[in-house]
């Protein structure tokens, strides 16, 4: 697994000669992390990449923000498993990302301590719920896990006969494409059929590095 290099708000402030100290209250509540690669895509304060990764004071406005906007806690039969629809569930396998998107619907969890997923209990629940045929690995970002840990999770799910579809939701191809290594690809290939869902939000993110990762 490649190491992750990040850029701090202080470094961004120095680079763009702007004061960001007022954002410390936001990052204290909702942590900030920006990969060096993704920070390198920023061309000016408040451009489309900046707005996705640099905190804003509006995040602390309780009149327009909800800590759990999708009501996921109520839909978690065991810690870290979200069972909203009858035939599919979301398994939260990491609470870290290469870059913390400011629009994240799980920012209450990402980058914070506590609330860890009980993976054995989650797999037991899935195994005991035969209508579950589609499992989505999410987080955080599953590709932040070391290859061997992700391999073990995928292997455990593959042993459940009624699990037909496994999907991985990841922004790593967008925010840290060097993580997509030949070794990772070989490991993922062992678990086919496997689907990786990612999303690009702006043309500025469509770089040669991201294209190679995809």
Predicted regions and their residues:
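Flexible, acidic/Gly-rich N-terminal and inter-domain linker regions that tether
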Residues: 1-84
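Eukaryotic intrinsically disordered, low-complexity regions
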Residues: 136-138
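Conserved aromatic-histidine-acidic binding/catalytic patches
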Residues: 26, 89, 141-142
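Short secondary-structure boundary/capping elements
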Residues: 73-74, 85, 117-118, 149, ...
């Amino acid at each position: 697994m490649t190491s992750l290099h990040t850029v701090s708000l202080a470094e961004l402030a120095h680079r763009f000669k702007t004061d960001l100290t007022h954002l410390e209250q936001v990052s204290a509540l909702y942590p900030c992390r920006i990969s060096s690669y993704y920070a390198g895509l920023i061309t000016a304060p408040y451009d489309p990449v900046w707005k996705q990764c640099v905190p804003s004071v509006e995040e602390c406005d309780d009149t327009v923000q909800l800590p759990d906007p999708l009501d996921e806690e109520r839909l978690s039969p065991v810690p870290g498993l979200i069972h909203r629809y009858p035939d599919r569930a979301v398994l939260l396998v990491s609470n870290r990302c290469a870059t913390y998107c400011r629009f994240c619907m799980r920012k209450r969890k990402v980058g914070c301590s506590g609330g860890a997923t009980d993976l054995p209990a989650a797999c037991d629940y899935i195994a005991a719920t035969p209508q579950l045929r589609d499992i989505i690995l999410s987080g955080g970002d599953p590709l932040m896990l070391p290859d061997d840990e992700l391999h073990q999770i995928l292997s455990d799910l593959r042993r459940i006969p009624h699990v037909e579809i496994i999907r991985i939701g990841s922004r790593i191809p967008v925010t840290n494409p060097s993580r997509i290594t030949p070794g990772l690809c070989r490991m993922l290939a062992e678990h086919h059929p496997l689907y990786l869902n990612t999303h690009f939000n702006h043309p500025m993110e469509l770089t040669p590095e991201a294209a190679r990762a995809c």
